[in-house]
A protein has these predicted regions:
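ATP-binding glycine-rich phosphate-binding loop
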Residues: 9-31
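Protein kinase catalytic-loop region centered on the HRD/HxD motif
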Residues: 157-163
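Catalytic-loop of the protein kinase fold
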Residues: 164-166, 171
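Helix-rich C-terminal or lid/interface subdomains of diverse kinases
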Residues: 199, 203, 207-244
Length: 244
């Protein structure tokens, strides 16, 4: 159906401007019901979109700042691979204090998603100790030595409790104001050990002690290497994962 599906949000619904940052999706600012919003068109399955939409609604009810699905005229969360979400104001984190606020927000996300089901088709880092594939990850495409290093990093997370992790808390996906921290772009969100989020933060923002920080940083670097393999960023992240 493509962008023609935008008409399901009303006769006046229209695309405004293409937005940067969408790798797996076509992302635009849109106007729906006279309000600015964001439209995202991609190839995700209905089950995947339902998981994400349900999560975002739950986070909104829990008081976390994140995009919220805008329903079609007939009450659907998405249609034809298109999801429309509220526009989130704010800028990226710049200071160490900003990043500490991000860490607090991620911990709030982890607290309110206990028992959340796994995103359809995804696997956690500890699942990949034995599995070879899971949505964005294909360990068979990596050199065997790289797989050994990644699995050694993830093995240190074995037995930990799992929650929903954002999966990609980089500055482009964070919108700060003086009042709150919002997380956008939930494409990489799934159920995993919270260390994957916390280990990705700069400046020691998560406040972990030395050993815990090392475990989190190694696991996060291994995850990003595997998810992005094999672009230059993935190679860079793999270089941060210690050899076994």
């Amino acid at each position: 159906m493509g962008w023609e599906a935008l008409g399901l949000w009303g006769e006046d619904a229209a695309r405004i401007e293409k937005l940067a940052g969408g790798v797996a999706n076509d992302v635009w600012s849109v106007r729906v019901g006279g309000k600015l919003a964001v439209g995202r068109l991609g190839q995700r399955s209905d089950a995947d979109l339902a998981w994400e939409a349900g999560l975002l609604q739950h986070l909104d009810r829990q008081g976390l700042a994140a995009p919220v699905p805008v329903l079609t005229i007939d009450g659907r969360l998405f249609a034809g691979g298109l999801m429309v979400m509220t526009f989130v104001e704010g800028g990226p984190p710049k200071t160490e204090e900003d990043w500490r606020r991000v860490a607090d927000t991620l911990r709030q996300l982890h607290r309110v998603t206990e028992g959340w089901p796994q995103r359809p088709g995804w696997r956690s880092s500890t699942d990949l100790l034995t599995a070879d594939t899971g949505t964005r990850i294909d360990l068979t495409a990596m050199p065997p030595e790289a797989v050994v290093r990644c699995r050694a990093a993830w093995a240190r997370l074995a037995g930990r409790e799992t929650r929903v992790v954002h999966g990609d808390p980089n500055p482009r996906n964070i919108r700060l104001t003086a009042e709150r921290v919002a997380l956008i772009d939930w494409d990489e969100a799934h159920v995993d050990v919270p260390d994957l989020d916390l280990g990705a933060l700069p400046h020691g923002a998560a406040g972990l002690e030395a050993t815990a920080r090392d475990i989190a940083a190694q696991a996060s670097a291994a995850w990003e290497a595997a998810v992005c393999w094999k672009d230059d960023y993935a190679v860079k992240r793999l270089a941060e994962v210690r050899a076994v």
